[in-house]
């Protein structure tokens, strides 16, 4: 047995197939067991790859290298024992790098905003007539892209990789000066506390994110992020974006500018795009930050302004990120249902509320993460008409809201009930405004949990899809 892959998620599945296609013997091992994993087990067995499920990880006999899926903790006891035996341990992203290091990469990381930024960069490459494959923590697993490239099924010009802290933690060689060079462009969107249950400390979490920037040839950073600004002297060849300042400048080239004025994007003085439609599809200041980060990366990659313009016009936004999934007209009042299930921490929850105008009915809760909810709670008090809380964190969050004298709170058992109760609350607000003679204005029912999904769902996508289905079913029932 030459290679052992730990974890049978989509990344582990792709890694196993990549290794097998290169002629290696492969064993896949996952401690979990489920119908989905058994389906994948059957597929791999047919491809000559044995799979063990539902057993604690063990090192198989004769293994020369262990490949780790992003969901497996890098300090897992088995991995510590493997390293002590001198057996190499690599992450799935690093494995893919071995086969993709001949291509230029844009690597994008950050606590929030990285998926939208990655998708925007990929859209800009597409608009330029180039294949910039969005992959990694978004889209295709990196190993799947590597295999498809080796087989000639994909012919990427660039790799546009969203890289999570889990992937960067397990990618020391990817982030080092190996033959083929480091990622060409590194982008860091934001930094706030997250995943501390995995990484232990904020400093350790930051160190994994910083790996990408330390090794990139060019860097694009959010100049409005307090943590990143404190590290301004750490990196050369860096572009800093800002909505507050009139321009983006490169430390080495002050003439390279990118700025927003009067809802227009300018690059080196040329008006590239009107942003009113983009702001409607992708609301919030954070999405303008994402746009600036993507445009800066695109310019560093040599893309023309016309490609950036075309991508801005065509970009439809991302599922589960302030995604409008339904609208119900109640008299003169439109009630909009917005899916922000990707908001899995307090900072993301704050960003969503900050992007929308009141009145807002908020659905929140799930499995709480470490972090300070203070700013999020204060914005709820300022902008939210009613809060519906679900999941493990509901009692704790309700108590926290009571602590700041916010009392329009209801605990609900499921998302189905939350949608029904939120719609009832929105209708009540509409009737109240009508009685008071106030002009009709849109009411937003917002799912922005500010918590992880794993208490009730398999992923934030699962939770967001359920919300979308509930809202569209409600809309359909009222249209009949």
Swiss-Prot record:
Annotated GO MF terms: ATP binding; UDP-N-acetylmuramoylalanine-D-glutamate ligase activity
Gene Ontology CC annotation, any one: cytoplasm
Record Gene3D superfamilies: Mur ligase, C-terminal domain (3.90.190.20), Mur-like, catalytic domain (3.40.1190.10), NAD(P)-binding Rossmann-like Domain (3.40.50.720)
List of residues binding ATP: 110-116
InterPro entries xrefs: Mur-like_cat_sf, Mur_ligase_C_dom_sf, Mur_ligase_cen, MurD
Subcellular location: Cytoplasm
Disulfide bonds: none
Pathway participation: Cell wall biogenesis; peptidoglycan biosynthesis
SUPFAM superfamilies: MurCD N-terminal domain (SSF51984), MurD-like peptide ligases, catalytic domain (SSF53623), MurD-like peptide ligases, peptide-binding domain (SSF53244)
E.C. numbers: 6.3.2.9
Functional note: Cell wall formation. Catalyzes the addition of glutamate to the nucleotide precursor UDP-N-acetylmuramoyl-L-alanine (UMA).
Family in the record: Belongs to the MurCDEF family.
PANTHER family: UDP-N-ACETYLMURAMOYLALANINE--D-GLUTAMATE LIGASE
Listed name of the protein: UDP-N-acetylmuramoylalanine--D-glutamate ligase
Organism for this UniProt entry: Synechococcus sp. (strain JA-2-3B'a(2-13))
Gene for this chain: murD
